[in-house]
């Protein structure tokens, strides 16, 4: 019983560490490297007719998330 609990604890720690290290949303590529981000930012820019929004979306993760959220509400 103690051995199985120890194994489960170790597995949980490994999964938590991997999840934290590899699924950070701030690791998303910028517009130059990521097609999904580029398309989302272009759609957001078309809706606002402000070129500054495209630049903000490409450079700032928070602006990208906000843009994606606003686009999903319109659908």
Curated annotation (Swiss-Prot):
UniProt-recorded name of the protein: Kappa-scoloptoxin(03)-Ssm1d
Subcellular location as annotated: Secreted
Key words of the record: Disulfide bond, Ion channel impairing toxin, Neurotoxin, Potassium channel impairing toxin, Secreted, Signal, Toxin, Voltage-gated potassium channel impairing toxin
Record family assignment: Belongs to the scoloptoxin-03 family.
Stated role: Inhibits voltage-gated potassium channels.
UniProt keyword annotation of Disulfide bond present: yes
Signal peptide feature range: 1-23
Gene Ontology molecular function: any one: potassium channel regulator activity
Post-translational modification: Contains 3 disulfide bonds.
Organism listed in the record: Scolopendra mutilans (Chinese red-headed centipede)
Cellular-component GO terms for this entry: extracellular region
Presence of keyword Nucleotide-binding: no
Expressing tissues: Expressed by the venom gland.
Main location: secreted
